[in-house]
C-alpha cells in the first residue's frame, strides 16, 4: 500500500488534504540578490515598511532584507501564515528547499507539530552556483546515495529521525551544468527504484523544461511521478506548452500571487498575472489535462508574507479558487488539482 512520507512520519494518501505543492517556509535566497537601481537604492536598503513596500514589490531581489528568508522575523511571519493557511482549509505543504538553499528541517518539523499542517520535505540539489565545497564535486553515485539515505534512512534533527518524502527541487540553469546534470540523473535513477515523486526547476527559457525532462527520462525516471515547476514564467506559448505536456509530467503553475509584470530575474519577459494563470489552467483543463495540473505560490521572499504586506500561503484557497469557480471550473476539477493530483504524485511505497 502506498503512503506519503511527511516530516512527522508516513500517512495514507487520503489524509493529505488540499495541498500546496511548491512552497518554502525558510530558505537562504541571498545568492539572487541584485544591486538596486541607483534612483531607488536608499529605499531598498531600508527595512520593509509601508513607505518602501512599493519599491520592494517591483525590485524584490534588490532588498537584502527581503531575500533573507531565514531570520527570526521571517520564521515568525512564515509561522503566522501557515496557521492562516490551516485556518482556511489547507491540509499540506510540500517544502521544496533542497541542498544549496539551506533548508531548515528543524523549523519545518516544528511547524508540522504546532500547526497541524502536513509537511513533506525534499532532498536534491539546487543550481551549482548555490552549493558549498562539500557538494560541488559529488558524483552521480554519491548523489544517489545521499538522496536515497535522506528518503529511506532519514536525517537526525535534534534527536528525531526525519525522512524526506520526494526529490526536489532539483534545479538547473541553461544549458545544464555538469553538477546539475549529475543531480538530474541521480533523481531519475532513484525515482525508478523507489517510485517517489520528483520536482524539477527549469531555467527561465522555454527550451529548459524539455532538456531537463530528457535527462531525467533517460536516467529511468517516470514522467507520471515528475513535476515541472514554474511553467508560468517559462513557457508562455500555449502550443509549445501543449507540446511539452506530451512528455507526461505534471504541469505546475506555482507563482500565484506574483502580480508584478516586471520579472527581475528575467527582464526580457513579462510575468503573467493571476488572471492569466487561471485562463491558462482553464485552457489546459479543456485539453483534458486536469489530472496533470498543480497549483502553488513558491513563496521565497518576505514581501509575499502577510506580515510584510503580501498574500500568504492561503491566497490560492481564499482568492483564486473562488475566481475559478466563477469561470466554470467545477469542484471536482479543483479537488483533482489541489487534492488528488498532489496525493498521487507524492505516494510511493515509503
Swiss-Prot record:
A divalent metal cation 2 binds at residues 169, 201, 230. It is an enzyme of class 3 (hydrolase). SUPFAM superfamilies: Metallo-dependent hydrolases. A divalent metal cation 1 binds at residues 22, 24, 169, 298. Binds 2 divalent metal cations per subunit. Pfam families: PTE. Coiled coil: none annotated. CDD domains: PTE (cd00530). Belongs to the metallo-dependent hydrolases superfamily. Phosphotriesterase family. This is Phosphotriesterase-related protein. It comes from Drosophila virilis. The lineage of its organism: Eukaryota, Metazoa, Ecdysozoa, Arthropoda, Hexapoda.
Amino acid at each position: 500500500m502506498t503512503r506519503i512520507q511527511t516530516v512527522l512520519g508516513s500517512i495514507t494518501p487520503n489524509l493529505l488534504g488540499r495541498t500546496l505543492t511548491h512552497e518554502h517556509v525558510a530558505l537562504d535566497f541571498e545568492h539572487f540578490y541584485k544591486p538596486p537601481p541607483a534612483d531607488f537604492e536608499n529605499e531598498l536598503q531600508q527595512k520593509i515598511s509601508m513607505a518602501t513596500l512599493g519599491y520592494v514589490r517591483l525590485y524584490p531581489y534588490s532588498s537584502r532584507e527581503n531575500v533573507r528568508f531565514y531570520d527570526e522575523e521571517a520564521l515568525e511571519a512564515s509561522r503566522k501564515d501557515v496557521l492562516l493557511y490551516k485556518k482556511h482549509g489547507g491540509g499540506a505543504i510540500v517544502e521544496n528547499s533542497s541542498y544549496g538553499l539551506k533548508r531548515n528541517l528543524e523549523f519545518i518539523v516544528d511547524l508540522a507539530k504546532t500547526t497541524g499542517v502536513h509537511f513533506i520535505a525534499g532532498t536534491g540539489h539546487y543550481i551549482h552556483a548555490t552549493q558549498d565545497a562539500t557538494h560541488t564535486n559529488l558524483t552521480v553515485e554519491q548523489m544517489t546515495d545521499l538522496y536515497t539515505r535522506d528518503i529511506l534512512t532519514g536525517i537526525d534533527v535534534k534527536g528525531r529521525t526525519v525522512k524526506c518524502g520526494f526529490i526536489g527541487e532539483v534545479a538547473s540553469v541553461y544549458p545544464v551544468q555538469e553538477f546539475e546534470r549529475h543531480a538530474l540523473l541521480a533523481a531519475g535513477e532513484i525515482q525508478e527504484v523507489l517510485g517517489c515523486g520528483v520536482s524539477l526547476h527549469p531555467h527561465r527559457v522555454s527550451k529548459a523544461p524539455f532538456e531537463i525532462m530528457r535527462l531525467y527520462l533517460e536516467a529511468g525516471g517516470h514522467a507520471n511521478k515528475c513535476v515541472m515547476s514554474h511553467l508560468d514564467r517559462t513557457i508562455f506559448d500555449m502550443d509549445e506548452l501543449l507540446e511539452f505536456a506530451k512528455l507526461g509530467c505534471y504541469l505546475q503553475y506555482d507563482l500565484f500571487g506574483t502580480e508584478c509584470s516586471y520579472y527581475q530575474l528575467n527582464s526580457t519577459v513579462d510575468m503573467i498575472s493571476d488572471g492569466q494563470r487561471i485562463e491558462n489552467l482553464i485552457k489546459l483543463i479543456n485539453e483534458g489535462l486536469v489530472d496533470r495540473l498543480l497549483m502553488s505560490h513558491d513563496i521565497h521572499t518576505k514581501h509575499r508574507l502577510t506580515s510584510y504586506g503580501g498574500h500568504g500561503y492561503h491566497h490560492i484557497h481564499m482568492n483564486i479558487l473562488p475566481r475559478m469557480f466563477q469561470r466554470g471550473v467545477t469542484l471536482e476539477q479543483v479537488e483533482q488539482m489541489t487534492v488528488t493530483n498532489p496525493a498521487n504524485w507524492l505516494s510511493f511505497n515509503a
